[in-house]
Amino acid sequence: MKKSIVNKLKSLKKRYIQLEKLLSNNYSKFDKREFSKLSKEKANLYDLYKEFMSWLSIKSEIKDIQLLLNDLDLSTLAQEELLIALKRKKEIEKKIKMLLIPIDPYDKNSCFIEIRAATGGHEAAIFSGDLCKMYMKYADFKSWKVDIINMHEGEKGGYKEIILKVIGIGACGRLKFESGGHRVQRVPQTESQGRVHTSACTVAIMPEVPKSKRIILNTSDLKIDTFRSSGAGGQHVNTTDSAVRITHLPTGCVVECQDERSQHKNKEKALSVLSAKIYSKMNAEKKLKNSLMRKSLLGTGERSDRNRTYNFSQNRVTDHRINLTIYRLNEVLLGKLDLLIEPLLQEHQADLLSIID
């Protein structure tokens, strides 16, 4: 391992031992909150500490075995043991590097999916409906709950825009690579000549930010409009101003919600989505400014950002970020998204590991 990694591990080892002494000898000195904080820090360091101690042990063992290589009687056995020990050392180093990969604090969270029809008119809206169904089926496979926050239906079907909330542990971590441009190549339902058209949609994945960690939104920065709902809602539709549109003036982020009959509930939902949008915008700007990865797997959600192409006539899906092509489009649309998500996650991990190396 690189000297810089070993030095970091030595520092983490020192901190772990320090925490162990603090928590065992000074239990009564800490209040409940401080004790919980230190215990959590110790628990987070445990796996790295354990693997580093194993690495130090195997390193010492290798030195002892190497001394036996010059012994004529034991050299053959020593060579065999050395190969086993070196293999074990390599395995431990791989585990350590995996543990050193920074964890996105929002990977375990629920998330919002915003799907917008881009180029292609009615066909783009229809395709956004197909993507919506795909994500809903994938969520069903994962036993996640899906709520529709807001939607604007297309004239010929599908959606001009739809926002879903996917509720479940790990939803954001698995879906975050869906952000970006999604292009479809097929013969539209409205095409009489049988010609293949190319249309596009954009997808943005935004983590649900817990209330305790949400960005404080100043009332003076918000423009709140109310209007009559045009969606589901029974007798309340078009009779009360229950729908809410909130604009965050400093960033230009706009969110609408008309899913609930109550204006208060719509406002609460809209603020939740707005907080996620602002966080995602700030996070994207931060990543762009301080990019640690040589190759970005996360799309910007803009029209020019073509992450994936869905070709219906060939039953083909191509993810352009990792040059992956599979001829199982029918399965992907039925919710088997892990066929694409798993390779993306593996590539993401490999990219982060290369930085550590």
UniProtKB/Swiss-Prot annotation:
Pfam family of the protein (one): PCRF
Entry's Gene Ontology molecular function annotations: translation release factor activity, codon specific
Localisation per UniProt entry: Cytoplasm
Keyword Cytoplasm included in the entry's annotation: yes
Residue numbers of N5-methylglutamine PTMs: Q235
GO cellular component term of the entry, any: cytoplasm
Post-translational modification remark: Methylated by PrmC. Methylation increases the termination efficiency of RF1.
Predominant subcellular localization, coarse grouping: cytoplasm
UniProt keywords, alphabetically: Cytoplasm, Methylation, Protein biosynthesis
NCBIfam families documented for this protein: prfA, PRK00591.1
Function: Peptide chain release factor 1 directs the termination of translation in response to the peptide chain termination codons UAG and UAA.
Protein family according to the UniProt entry: Belongs to the prokaryotic/mitochondrial release factor family.
Stated name of the protein: Peptide chain release factor 1
Organism expressing this protein natively: Buchnera aphidicola subsp. Cinara cedri (strain Cc)
Organism taxonomic ancestry: Bacteria, Pseudomonadati, Pseudomonadota, Gammaproteobacteria, Enterobacterales
